[in-house]
């Protein structure tokens, strides 16, 4: 994103990251952090599409909506309804962090 490096170096990084994500069989969970106030940004939609293009049956994408303290109750309910398996968090008031920790442990360690 914001690194001041040559275009060639960025392409090398992209290639290496792409290979790592696609070939690493030990990855069981991708955690996709999304700003809860901006749920349909192109960057998030593109990442979702990219991950789904190579997701294996034993892998999962967990959508985590951040900054939920900035939403009212009706906006939170709408978000939960639209994204059933997502987790809503707020670092400011620590909302949802226990749920996130539990889900990451469950998905990665099976506990």
Predicted regions and their residues:
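Switch II (G3) loop of P-loop NTPases
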Residues: 1-16
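Conserved protein kinase catalytic core
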Residues: 1-5, 41, 72-73, 96
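Amphipathic alpha-helical transducer elements in NTP-driven molecular machines
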Residues: 10-14, 45, 94-97
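Conserved C-terminal guanine-recognition region of P-loop GTPase G domains, centered on the G4
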Residues: 14-85
